[in-house]
Amino acid sequence: MKCKRCTTSEGCLVSRNETFCGECFSRFVLLKFRKQMMMDEYCQQVFKVLYADKHRTAVEADEQNKRSVVLVPLSLGSSSLAMLDLLNQTLSEQRAAHNRTGFQVKVVLCGFSADMDELKRLAESLQTERLAMNSDCIKLYLLDLDRSFSTCEIHKLLLANDNHGSRKIATRENATLSSILDQFSRRSSRDDMLWFARQHLIKKFASQHQVKVIMWGHSVTRLADEVMSLVIKGRGAQIAATLDSTGMDVEYGALFKNLYPLRDVLLSEIDAYCSLSKLQRYIYNYSLQGSLFIKSQDEAAQANRAVPMAKNMTINELTRQYFDAVEKDYSNVISTIVRTASKLDYPISNGTEVIYCSICNNRVYVDPSKWLKSITVNNCHPPASDEDMSMLQMWESSSKGKETLARNQARSNIWSTAAEAPLCYGCVVTLNETKDRELNWPSREHDVSQVLAEFTLTDEE
């Protein structure tokens, strides 16, 4: 079967009911990527090569090209790796056409201490083998997630037992991100907290390094998954901010934009691109899908892939499983979800003061504690008989009762001196599942530059 684009080469895969050869398909993905890169005037000024004109001199144009810095959060999954490869192609084409480039790229690779050696090996291979031609304008940084939180101020967040109010106190306890995540019993909550921590560090790095655009490697499948997951978790108010690619990120000083250049590309298409571009050897902790290829080379692997039990899956994994099932035949379902969600506006706040959640750093529009208090019974039923009173006194005199009463009294004493710690509804629900409704969580105000600098990969290493 011939490729429908060039009509000369043999087709190797089918996507969106169209047959592609490898070269035409790679071009198809590249064009969708470029379209999002140049979506508005701001992005055009960041990505294109600037020359002297009536607005700037040649020296000013060169300086602006150097100051056009974009940040790529790299997970070494298929999406972020494909995006970095497409960016590298763009830089190479600019260098060939203009003998210069229009922007600089900073790449941040986050991982836990146990994964650092393998991540560094893959990053060094990627830098020397795939990015060597543009090594002067692509710099890679490794960030140890555990070490990044070991030096910052830690707050203990407390959730009230009776009215769902929240407070925070400073604590001298040392914490790594791994120990913070261990406070949660459910994988879904741990994944949420890991994403909030990773996102905060990336955006903090962007605000400290004059970054103009953060390029997130989310496919349209991942974005649809994220939209549905936010609704399920009670975080629907965050959808508008999550998908906003036009406004500046006000939570971090309105210094940069968040861009999703692969938002028109399906995850299966990104996986196919990685296979065609021979990026498999750089992928970490992810298996490529081969569902689009006419002669799939990994049919056996796909057939033997273990399907986890639903009760062991996170909310994101459950929604991803659904979208994986419908992506091939009903891809319009996925794009419709993202397109509809992109039309949502920011919620209207009840007050004039701008308040941010102490955990996820998203804006709080309505105080969830007041709403929860209005729909729940918050007080225990009092003893109704002498027998009830006798049983209560027996419990109070028991070791378990004394321990509980002492803990509640200590918590009450702390509560009276603790500071306000606003939480969004989703984080109230998450904090409610922790032991004693307490959570050690890092302060937003800390500098990640020192930790990043220690792991910067340079040409000499």
From Swiss-Prot:
The keyword tRNA processing is annotated on this UniProt entry: yes
SUPFAM superfamilies on file: Adenine nucleotide alpha hydrolases-like
Presence of keyword Ribosomal protein: no
A Pfam family recorded for this sequence: CTU2
Location of this chain's protein in the cell: Cytoplasm
Predominant location: cytoplasm
A cellular component term, taken from the record's GO annotations: cytosol
Entry keywords, A to Z: Cytoplasm, tRNA processing
GO molecular function: nucleotidyltransferase activity; sulfurtransferase activity; tRNA binding
Annotated coiled-coil segments of the chain: none
Stated role: Plays a central role in 2-thiolation of mcm(5)S(2)U at tRNA wobble positions of tRNA(Lys), tRNA(Glu) and tRNA(Gln). May act by forming a heterodimer with NCS6 that ligates sulfur from thiocarboxylated URM1 onto the uridine of tRNAs at wobble position. Prior mcm(5) tRNA modification by the elongator complex is required for 2-thiolation. May also be involved in protein urmylation.
Protein's name according to its UniProt entry: Cytoplasmic tRNA 2-thiolation protein 2
Similarity field: Belongs to the CTU2/NCS2 family.
InterPro entries xref list: CTU2, Rossmann-like_a/b/a_fold
Pathway: tRNA modification; 5-methoxycarbonylmethyl-2-thiouridine-tRNA biosynthesis
Any single biological process term in GO: protein urmylation
